[in-house]
């Protein structure tokens, strides 16, 4: 069976990347294979995770390359050299242009640490999301996996999972619970759905064929 060739994009520690690797090694992504990790930072711990698991990694730094255009050209070169069919944004802090997302239309997915459309879009990333949820006083938060388009966090939703907020939560505690109870579960599941061709996109919505 030919497996879908996956690239995972990261910017930091790579905990979601590690969750994907573990899922792959445990046979939970039978239709896909992670063949490349792209980091936007040369100091990201995710690079060590890739090395530990024998996964090829490259660093594409917008700061070092000097412009969005050169940044995306370098990424595209690596994607094409490795015949990438699916891109997974797993804590990737750089915004991709409309031209880039169009080139890989319906082949880029992202994990976001809230129940979209709450606490998403420009400025909502990392701990900021959980700080906003606690400040608003919502009782339930969670995570969302969605198709990436030109609108930040605006593409069709593939999967969501809710997580209850507890009375003494801090942004850090909530972030950890959302990762453990939601992100690390629905991201590998969504990747497998994409790789197996079960996700159908129609009129801005997704439908999963079992």
Whereabouts are the PLM-identified features?
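One-carbon transfer enzymes
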Residues: 1-210
């Amino acid at each position: 069976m030919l497996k879908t060739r996956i690239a995972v994009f990261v910017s930091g520690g790579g905990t979601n990347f590690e969750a994907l690797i573990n899922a792959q090694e445990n046979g939970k992504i039978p239709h896909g294979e992670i063949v490349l990790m792209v980091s936007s930072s040369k100091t990201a711990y995710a690079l060590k995770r890739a090395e530990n698991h024998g996964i090829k990694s490259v660093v594409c730094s917008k700061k070092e390359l000097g412009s969005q255009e050169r940044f995306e050209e370098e990424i595209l070169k690596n994607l094409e050299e490795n015949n990438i069919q699916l891109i997974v944004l797993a804590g990737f802090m750089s915004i991709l242009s409309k031209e880039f997302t169009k080139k890989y239309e319906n082949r880029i997915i992202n994990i976001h640490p809230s129940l979209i459309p709450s606490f998403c879009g420009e400025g909502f990333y990392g701990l900021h999301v959980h700080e906003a949820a606690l400040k608003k006083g919502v009782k339930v938060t969670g995570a969302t996996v969605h198709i990436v388009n030109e609108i930040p966090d605006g593409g069709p939703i593939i999967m969501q999972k809710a997580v209850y907020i507890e009375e003494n939560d801090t942004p850090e505690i909530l972030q950890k619970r959302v990762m453990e109870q939601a992100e690390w579960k629905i991201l590998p599941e969504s990747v497998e759905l994409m790789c197996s061709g079960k996700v159908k996109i129609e009129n801005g919505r997704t439908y999963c064929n079992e």
